[in-house]
Amino acid sequence: PDEAARKVKAVAAAVPPRAVLGIAGPGDGAYDWAKTRETFARVAAELPDLKLCLSTNGLALPERVEELKAMNVAHVTVTINMVDPHVGEAIHPWIFHDHRRHTGLEAARILHARQMESLERLAEADILVKVNSVLIPGINDDHMADVHQAVTARGAFLHNIMPLIARAE
């Protein structure tokens, strides 16, 4: 948090006008919540005009929504690559949730449920939501229309689909 706050201040001073601070890693900002919350608090105290944004996969997000609203986080970006757990198990073979590792279809079902809950809670809290999806040829390319329908129905104001471009090694 100290290093992040220093870097934000330096960039904000060098590149006006400043608009948005997004936390997107390392790791998942909603999962490593103590560091994310502290970074947001320090930056907001020193640069109150800066808008705050969180990027996450949504797994740890539902419990953070009320705090995000209280901290005046302007918007949240959630990466959602599937809404069918059968598709999801090929993309997300495992997750770590509730202090344990989940694998396969169970992992994809949990991730999907948590992502949809996150979108619904963010919409209820009037926090703008953008969804990013990675289109993976042969895995979820035929599934993007379903993803789009599900996320926009739950309040996403923008759905950004980005193709995975794999290169041979």
Regions found by a protein language model. Give the residues of each.
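Conserved alpha-helical substructure of the radical SAM core
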Residues: 1-23, 30-39, 45-46
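Conserved AdoMet/S-adenosylmethionine-binding subsite of the radical SAM
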Residues: 30-162, 167
